[in-house]
Structures are given as structure tokens and as C-alpha cells.
Regions:
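Accessory RNA-recognition modules of RNA-modification enzymes
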Residues: 1-190
Length: 190
């Protein structure tokens, strides 16, 4: 709380007496895990050429495989496992930033805490997803799945999403009780 107060005064330029008058006590989270409603995972390959999902190592583009991030919902792991299994079974390649080759670049997942609806979006380096019915069959087995999309990003860029998103199953959005806003893959909601 003192750090926030100090930053408001030092960085924000607010008068100390003003901050002291309006600032309320900071309340911690009752449960500091599994609270994120959106996750995005880069897709790459391990040393054996097998597809992996994870996070970038600090200040690099090297992917550290992550089986489960405790900030995201448990369904993230189930969805990633299904996508990686699909990639292995159908011989779908992961994107390689160095060569610009390979198909699957990222996976974005959204979860509606009130609606219990799930959205999965695959960002691809192409215009179509081979054997997409096999992927749909896997993902629709997951309770709550409402939306499966493919986003096309063929640019050599570190921007995750491309211009075009195609809903390949379900609806192009999920709904949650955030003032009943439709949540698509490119919207920021927290």
C-alpha cells in the first residue's frame, strides 16, 4: 500500500494529502490462482521436433514449454493438449520465426467465468487449417467449448493476430457477465 501511495505522489504528481484522503485500503485476492480469462501461448517445437506450447523466455523468442499456468483456468491445459495431439496426429507443423515456415503460430483461449463458455483460436501462417475436422472433433469434446476460430497471420512480425479471423465451429464469440459484452479473440477484457 505504501508503494502505491508513493507512486501516486512521485510518478502521478498527486498531493500527499489528496492521496491520503481518497486512497482506500488495498484488499488482496482471496484466491490468487486461476483468475485469468484470456491466455495466449506461442507454439514451437522441442529439440526432438515435437510441437510444444508455452511462454517466451525473458527477452527472447525461445519457447519454454509450460504444461499448466496457475494464473489461467484449468481448461487451458486441456485445450492445449488437444491441439498438440492434433498437430502430432495430423503432422501439422509449428511456425518457426527464423525460417518463416510452419503453420501454427499461437493459440489464444478465452473463458467466461459466469457463462462457463470457452473459445479457442489458432493463429496460423497460412489461409487454411488442414484436417480441421479432426481438430474440431477433439476440441468439441471439451465441456463448455462454444467457439473455434482460425486467425490468418502470414506476416513476418511479432504481432500475434492477423487481419482475418474465420470461425470454423460454433459462434465467433463467447458471452460472459461483463455487462453482457460479446468477447471475441481480438478484444481486451479483464
Amino acid at each position: 500500500q505504501n508503494k502505491v501511495r508513493g507512486n501516486l505522489i512521485r510518478l502521478g504528481g498527486f498531493a500527499a494529502d489528496f492521496v491520503d484522503r481518497i486512497m482506500e485500503p488495498i484488499v488482496g485476492m482471496a484466491e490468487p490462482f486461476r483468475y485469468r480469462n484470456k491466455a495466449q501461448f506461442p507454439i514451437g517445437t522441442d529439440r526432438d521436433g515435437q510441437p510444444i506450447a508455452g511462454f517466451y523466455a525473458a527477452r527472447t523468442h525461445s519457447i519454454i514449454p509450460v504444461e499448466d499456468c496457475l494464473l489461467g483456468v484449468g481448461e487451458n491445459k486441456v485445450i492445449l493438449d488437444a491441439i498438440l495431439e492434433y498437430m502430432r496426429a495430423e503432422h501439422i507443423s509449428a511456425y518457426d520465426e527464423t525460417t518463416g515456415k510452419g503453420l501454427i503460430r499461437h493459440v489464444l483461449i478465452r473463458y467466461g467465468f459466469t457463462s462457463k463458455e470457452l473459445m479457442a483460436a489458432l493463429v496460423i501462417n497460412g489461409t487454411r487449417l488442414p484436417h480441421q475436422e479432426a481438430l474440431i472433433q477433439r476440441l468439441t469434446q471439451i465441456p463448455g467449448m462454444k467457439s473455434i476460430s482460425v486467425n490468418c497471420n502470414r506476416e513476418n512480425t511479432n504481432v500475434i493476430l492477423g487481419e482475418e479471423t474465420i470461425c470454423i465451429w460454433g459462434t465467433p464469440y463467447i458471452t460472459d457477465d461483463i455487462h453482457l459484452c460479446d468477447c471475441s479473440d481480438d478484444r481486451f477484457i479483464q
